[in-house]
Amino acid sequence: FVSQIKLSKNFIKDRVKLALTEDLYPSGDVTSNLLKENKIITAKLICNQKAVIAGLLFAKQAFVQVDGKVKFLIKKKDGSLVKKNSLVATIKGKANSILIAERVALNFLSHISGIATKTNQFVKLAGKKCKICCTRKTIPNYRVIQKYAVKLGGGTNHRFNLSDEFLIKDNHIASSNIKSLVSNAIKNKKGKKITVE
């Protein structure tokens, strides 16, 4: 499976665009648009707990898509373990632009960092004798993002999709018999792993 997940700029752009569309449909941010358009502010993104930071490029992309003139300066790297009250990024630009993008940026950052942080806690508890693996039980269309977060937290990615390996489970066995399932898997193996649960 993929040992290092690389999220392309276009992938990140597309996901952020969907999130902004969801947040701003149909009339934009009517409250933030009440602010004076020229007021420039600087905001600090501070982590409120010890965490593994992940999803900074999603957060940055939210601000950039709302206003290309917003400056988002990343102070930590994705996968960094940060202490409580650490400065993660600074944002400078028009107040209304920053407030329009803020929630989408924070939602991505909180969700992805939350998965990475929780994974890291489990990895530390498990020690070196076992691996913490993630499954396909992910939010539809966000699997790559969630598996990226697990990887940053020190976890291991299991199957990305149904074609990665043969995984014969109780539901398969209930619909057939284990002997024929395993026999057919061996015939069609084509270099894929076969697992029976």
Give the residues covered by each predicted segment:
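Acidic/glycine-rich phosphate/pyrophosphate-binding loops and surrounding catalytic core
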Residues: F1-E197
